[in-house]
Amino acid sequence: MRRSLLPRGAVLAATALAATVLLAGPARADGFDPQASVRHDNNTYVPRIVVTVTRNGVRSGATVTGAPSTSYAHPPCWYFPSWEGPELARYFDGGQASRDAYHFGEKFDPPAGYQDHQNDGLDKGQWWGAMCSSEYWPDEDIHAFLDYASQWINSHPTIWVPVGAPNPNDAAIVIPPEVLVHIAEDFLTLPAPTLAHNPAGNSVVNLPTWVWATDESFAEQRVRAQFGANWAEVIARPVGLRLSVDGPARVDSDCANGGTPYRRGLSAQATTCSVTFLKSAPARTVSATLVWDVHWEGSDGTNEPLDPPATPEVGSFTTQVDEVQTVVDGTPAH
């Protein structure tokens, strides 16, 4: 994937199939390509970013927190070493900056104190510029990336980094919530429902078999990914149960709230989720998936819906279906 060094504030808008890159600093006349310096598979200039991931679930009304996990991320914007001191001084003092400014229709302001380093080679230090790449922006909204990248670059000017000084990325790196949410999604696991039913033994033809998801499986799931002060949390709430049967039956296919647990004394009409088998069978399997409402929240105030899983996990049970037998012995009553 080709990247070009652009004037500060300029935008290279590629097609939807290619990355969009923003780079701070003036264009170099020698055709310098930052790809040669910034290795994305083994980037020595960007610290390895460790994102903390925590998972919470609700069980029987109580919140259960899992052990924290870690993930790794590449920031969408970072600093990279670009110009040597004499190069940058020649660029501005030799007139090339003015010619490029005319070509791009922009004003190029030199970094503060650039003449102080006009004789400083790599043994003294190097100028570092800001770079952003949509390769590390997992959201398909390219306009959101451009807005974020423009703000980041405008607030991170080209700086001189002396030899032996800390990597400027140590303080500059930020992972925005828009990136963290995808890490949280990767860690989100939505369980299959654990099903209970009544009768607990064999079912009976033409009588409803109650079905419901247990409290332990019909439970909210949360995953939060955090780096520094930024975080994104994905919240998945079960809102229903979908049933199917591998044979002839009347089925409440969409059961709100996971079904109604059976209690002695409840009428047959009290159930919100049942299967009525129409024929006897040695074995019938009832399968179910949970219906999830999923959204995410971020440290920046974001609260947006997310798509539920396309192929949710399936829970099931197998039951024998019997006919009701009525026996009349013909003995007259006395």
Regions found by a protein language model. Give the residues of each.
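Short acidic/polar micro-motifs centered on Gly/Asp/Asn
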Residues: P238-L266
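A short, structured loop/turn motif at beta-sheet edges
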Residues: N202, S244-R250, L278-T285
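Extracellular-facing segments of soluble proteins and assemblies that are Gly/Ser/Thr-biased and enriched
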Residues: S133-N230
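Solvent-exposed segments in extracellular or luminal domains encompassing
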Residues: T260-S287, W292, E297
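Short beta-strand elements
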Residues: G301-V328
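Short proline/glycine-enriched turn/loop motifs at strand-loop junctions of beta-rich domains
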Residues: F218, I235-V239
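Secretory targeting and sorting signals
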Residues: M1-A29
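Solvent-exposed N-terminal domain segments of exported/luminal and surface proteins
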Residues: D30-N169
